[in-house]
Amino acid sequence: MEKVIVAKARTVSQDMTTICCTRYGNVLCSRGSVVPLFINQIKEGKPVTVTEPEMTRIIMRLEEAVELVIFAFANAESGDIMVQKAPACTIEVLAQAVKSLFHSENEIKIIGIRHGENMYETLLTNEACA
Protein backbone atom coordinates (compact mmCIF):
# COMPACT_ATOMS: atom_id res chain seq x y z
CA MET A 1 0.00 0.00 0.00
CA GLU A 2 2.84 2.38 0.81
CA LYS A 3 4.19 2.06 -2.74
CA VAL A 4 0.85 3.23 -4.13
CA ILE A 5 0.79 6.19 -1.74
CA VAL A 6 4.38 7.21 -2.50
CA ALA A 7 3.72 6.90 -6.25
CA LYS A 8 0.58 9.07 -5.97
CA ALA A 9 2.48 11.63 -3.88
CA ARG A 10 4.84 12.14 -6.83
CA THR A 11 1.96 13.06 -9.16
CA VAL A 12 0.25 15.82 -7.15
CA SER A 13 1.21 19.40 -6.50
CA GLN A 14 3.44 19.49 -3.43
CA ASP A 15 2.11 22.99 -2.66
CA MET A 16 -1.52 21.94 -2.31
CA THR A 17 -1.53 18.35 -1.10
CA THR A 18 0.62 16.27 1.21
CA ILE A 19 0.19 12.54 0.80
CA CYS A 20 1.92 10.36 3.36
CA CYS A 21 1.48 7.03 5.06
CA THR A 22 1.69 5.86 8.66
CA ARG A 23 2.77 2.32 9.41
CA TYR A 24 1.93 0.48 12.61
CA GLY A 25 2.82 -2.76 14.23
CA ASN A 26 0.07 -4.46 16.18
CA VAL A 27 -2.21 -2.03 17.99
CA LEU A 28 -3.13 -3.63 21.31
CA CYS A 29 -6.73 -4.85 21.56
CA SER A 30 -7.60 -3.70 18.04
CA ARG A 31 -9.43 -5.92 15.56
CA GLY A 32 -7.14 -8.80 14.66
CA SER A 33 -5.00 -8.36 17.77
CA VAL A 34 -4.13 -11.58 19.56
CA VAL A 35 -4.71 -10.04 23.01
CA PRO A 36 -8.54 -10.37 22.95
CA LEU A 37 -8.10 -14.01 21.86
CA PHE A 38 -5.78 -14.67 24.82
CA ILE A 39 -8.24 -12.97 27.21
CA ASN A 40 -11.19 -15.02 25.91
CA GLN A 41 -9.20 -18.25 26.18
CA ILE A 42 -8.25 -17.42 29.77
CA LYS A 43 -11.82 -16.50 30.75
CA GLU A 44 -13.13 -19.73 29.19
CA GLY A 45 -10.51 -21.83 31.00
CA LYS A 46 -8.94 -22.95 27.73
CA PRO A 47 -5.23 -23.23 26.92
CA VAL A 48 -3.70 -20.01 25.62
CA THR A 49 -2.76 -20.84 22.02
CA VAL A 50 0.57 -19.56 20.74
CA THR A 51 1.65 -20.25 17.17
CA GLU A 52 5.41 -20.05 17.74
CA PRO A 53 6.88 -18.85 21.08
CA GLU A 54 9.85 -17.03 19.53
CA MET A 55 7.77 -15.25 16.88
CA THR A 56 8.13 -11.50 17.36
CA ARG A 57 5.62 -8.76 16.85
CA ILE A 58 5.87 -5.00 17.22
CA ILE A 59 3.30 -3.81 19.73
CA MET A 60 1.89 -0.32 20.23
CA ARG A 61 -0.93 1.13 22.28
CA LEU A 62 -3.87 2.87 20.59
CA GLU A 63 -2.67 6.20 22.03
CA GLU A 64 0.71 5.72 20.31
CA ALA A 65 -1.00 4.99 16.99
CA VAL A 66 -3.08 8.17 17.31
CA GLU A 67 0.01 10.20 18.24
CA LEU A 68 1.74 8.92 15.10
CA VAL A 69 -1.14 10.15 12.92
CA ILE A 70 -1.11 13.55 14.63
CA PHE A 71 2.67 13.74 14.19
CA ALA A 72 2.26 12.90 10.49
CA PHE A 73 -0.34 15.66 10.05
CA ALA A 74 2.04 18.19 11.59
CA ASN A 75 5.38 17.08 10.15
CA ALA A 76 5.09 14.88 7.07
CA GLU A 77 6.16 15.83 3.60
CA SER A 78 4.55 14.30 0.56
CA GLY A 79 5.71 10.72 0.03
CA ASP A 80 6.83 10.16 3.61
CA ILE A 81 6.24 6.85 5.35
CA MET A 82 5.93 7.61 9.06
CA VAL A 83 7.03 4.81 11.39
CA GLN A 84 7.20 5.06 15.16
CA LYS A 85 9.99 3.22 16.90
CA ALA A 86 8.38 0.51 18.96
CA PRO A 87 9.77 -2.51 20.78
CA ALA A 88 9.26 -6.02 19.48
CA CYS A 89 8.13 -8.75 21.81
CA THR A 90 7.80 -12.49 21.44
CA ILE A 91 4.34 -13.99 21.31
CA GLU A 92 5.22 -16.12 24.33
CA VAL A 93 6.15 -13.05 26.41
CA LEU A 94 2.89 -11.38 25.37
CA ALA A 95 0.87 -14.47 26.30
CA GLN A 96 2.64 -14.69 29.68
CA ALA A 97 1.95 -10.98 30.32
CA VAL A 98 -1.78 -11.41 29.64
CA LYS A 99 -1.85 -14.52 31.84
CA SER A 100 -0.14 -12.55 34.60
CA LEU A 101 -2.69 -9.71 34.38
CA PHE A 102 -5.51 -12.21 34.86
CA HIS A 103 -3.65 -14.31 37.47
CA SER A 104 -4.18 -17.24 35.11
CA GLU A 105 -2.94 -20.79 35.50
CA ASN A 106 -4.04 -21.71 31.94
CA GLU A 107 -1.40 -23.66 30.07
CA ILE A 108 0.21 -22.26 26.94
CA LYS A 109 -0.35 -24.55 23.96
CA ILE A 110 2.00 -24.28 20.97
CA ILE A 111 -0.03 -24.75 17.78
CA GLY A 112 2.65 -24.03 15.17
CA ILE A 113 3.23 -21.28 12.66
CA ARG A 114 0.54 -20.84 10.02
CA HIS A 115 1.18 -20.68 6.29
CA GLY A 116 2.24 -17.19 5.25
CA GLU A 117 3.07 -15.94 8.75
CA ASN A 118 6.42 -14.28 9.33
CA MET A 119 8.57 -15.25 12.30
CA TYR A 120 9.84 -11.71 12.73
CA GLU A 121 7.91 -8.52 12.06
CA THR A 122 9.66 -5.63 10.36
CA LEU A 123 8.04 -2.24 9.96
CA LEU A 124 10.63 -0.75 7.64
CA THR A 125 13.17 -2.49 5.44
CA ASN A 126 16.33 -1.06 3.89
CA GLU A 127 14.60 -1.22 0.49
CA ALA A 128 11.70 0.91 1.74
CA CYS A 129 14.19 3.53 2.98
CA ALA A 130 15.88 3.84 -0.41
Identify what each model region corresponds to.
Residues N75-A130:
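Mid/C-terminal beta-alpha module of Rossmann-like enzyme folds, strongest
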